[in-house]
Amino acid sequence: LKNAYYLDTSAALKLVKLEAETPFLEAWMASEKSPVLISSDLLRTELIGNVLRLVPEGLQRAHDLMAEISFMKIRTEICTQAAMHVGLGLGTLDAIHLASAMACSSEIKGLITYDKKLIWASKKAGIGSITPIA
């Protein structure tokens, strides 16, 4: 996959709920000319849960976005790797996203996230993060 990126929930939510960074993320994605988006099955739960809580009128948009994402199963190896990141101070859900991104690191150009701890941890793991802002 030549133009693939791992998408975490903090970024996915900005594609459903209008936030300050939304126009910059949308412009970056347009400049990438149809990037392939990959994420963990965890994104399904996190995104829909957040949309229902914060912006229920965005539910269809969330489903449309998820239809464009290639989802990875949360396998035992990913949970084992994630536990190591939790031990280093990352939250459980972010650790699962990082371990998932690491599992497909040879296929992706980077991790799209707006989570500061995940940006730091992905850098330590050797995965570049993409955080489009002004």
Residue ranges and their predicted role:
Residues 2-4, 40, 44, 72, ...:
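Acidic, PIN/NYN-like endoribonuclease modules and their adjacent C-terminal/linker elements
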Residues 67-88, 95-100:
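Acidic catalytic patch
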Residues 1-39, 51-61, 126, 133-134:
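Short, well-structured N-terminal submotif of metal-dependent ribonuclease cores
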Residues 10-13, 48, 63, 83, ...:
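Amphipathic alpha-helical segments within well-ordered protein domains
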